[in-house]
Amino acid sequence: LPPCLEIDSGDCVVVDTVTGGPEHIPPENKGFHVPSELFDIHRDCPAMLPGHILTGPIAIKGALPGQVLQIDILDIKLRQNWGWNIIRPLAGTLPHEFQTARKVTIPLDLKTMTAELSWGLELPLNPFFGVMGVAPPRNWGRISSIQPRAHGGNIDNKELIAGTTLYLPIFEEGALFSCGDGHGAQGDGEVCVTAIETALSGRFRFSLRDDMALHTPQAETPTDFITMGIHEDLNRCTEDALRNMINLITAKTGLSREDAYMLCSLAGDLRVTQTVNGNKGIHMMMKKSLLEKAA
């Protein structure tokens, strides 16, 4: 796709997103705000493939294959006072166990940043973008946004909230970043196939990195480094996330691979990112403070 915006490395951009099909929009008389562009998109933009509504792509001048795009997630805000969650037969982590489709509309309180679940529970909101990615390699052809891959995409990592940084390998000139699939809250795994799906606005700073070499997404929070494994086999995901963390530790500290492997066993946290996107995800977290002491 041609870029909708071209920026310089280091620039900040505010990106508005929407989510959901016509069947997910609540009735007009329920007091829920629906961004007008969601109606426009469904009227004017037929879907090319199953997947998400994304905003982008954003081109970064001078971005070349082999570089890394650093995305600082500076702020995330809710754009509407509701979200939705569904069970879809033959989807999710237990695809044959729940055979009745179900959809719930979830009221969101933007002042208290809580969600009111229909069975009486109140959940804190911690919004993030489920999909953040650059253009995949051209030789992959046209692909759906549903499966995450080396270019990022539908990562669904709940750690990627405001104040964190995502690093993506660049495969095409301009990088061509897009995002969407806003989540108000999600558990590790996203087991029933959806989170609290909602419209978000994000403020990002994009920077080109020539001093990094990545083949899969990587991230960091103020306190932790995060490595990822993305594959249809969850065991392979685990191996890749662990191997990537070992490589990160040895690069940042000079520890041997054996010492780094042992440190991962003693202090690293392996977590299930998601189990529902075809390609599954595992991520490993390691405290930055430990690596500072080991350097």
Can you say where each PLM-predicted feature lies in the sequence?
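Intrinsically disordered, low-complexity linker/loop segments enriched in Gly/Pro
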Residues: 52-53, 72-162
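Conserved mixed alpha/beta catalytic, RNA-binding, or beta-rich assembly cores of soluble enzyme
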Residues: 125-235
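Short, conserved secondary-structure segments in the cores of folded domains
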Residues: 3, 56-59, 156
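Short, Lys/Arg- and Gly-enriched loop/turn segments at beta-strand edges
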Residues: 20-32, 76-86, 174-184, 273-275
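A generic structural signal for residues embedded in beta-strands
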Residues: 15, 68-71, 168
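N-terminal, Lys/Arg-enriched amphipathic/low-complexity engagement segments
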Residues: 1-46
